[in-house]
């Protein structure tokens, strides 16, 4: 009877400890011409593994508006629906505004102390550049790529922490960010896991994708068993 009571008390203690454990924070960066709310809505199936765990997801908006034909940048910046992390379209060699976005995200990271980062398309490239400096516990890049901007690419290539566990989700039919471009980003990380799907430029939500995302995050967090002071990012 005494043994059963001790087991019950131990289980109650573990449950209380788990309930009191701090929530893990994840920074989620949207793609070009999206915003945080759009990413949240379009990634509902993909992020189901996070809903079942103690994760707190953050969806900031990009600093800049995306210009349409005949629209100037000031008008675009006033549009809160179509945002970007830097000005310019795919293929341009100079990213105008990335320095401002980088500073803003570093400030947000220092304040919130994120544990992981998720990015889609332009947001994945931005998240990868942040990984090079901020060293999160894990990174998930959907349709990511190495930046075309030479200075940004050089900073990523020279500063990347190859040991950060990363998951690279690649659509084999993606014509906007080709699988080859996404693999070039994946090859920068020694701790990479590559997950392909038959779709195009999208965030997949199939059950097997969710299962692999959950397995990746669990394994990545298990790798980080040092004291929190050493594990948590410090700028």
Predicted regions mapped to residue ranges:
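Short alpha-helix in the alpha/beta-hydrolase fold that links the catalytic acid
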Residues: 41-44, 153-154, 178-187
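Short beta-strand/loop motif that positions the catalytic acidic residue
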Residues: 168-170
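Gly/Ala-rich beta-loop-alpha elbow adjacent to hydrolase catalytic centers
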Residues: 118-123, 127
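Serine-hydrolase catalytic machinery in alpha/beta-hydrolase-like enzymes
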Residues: 23-116
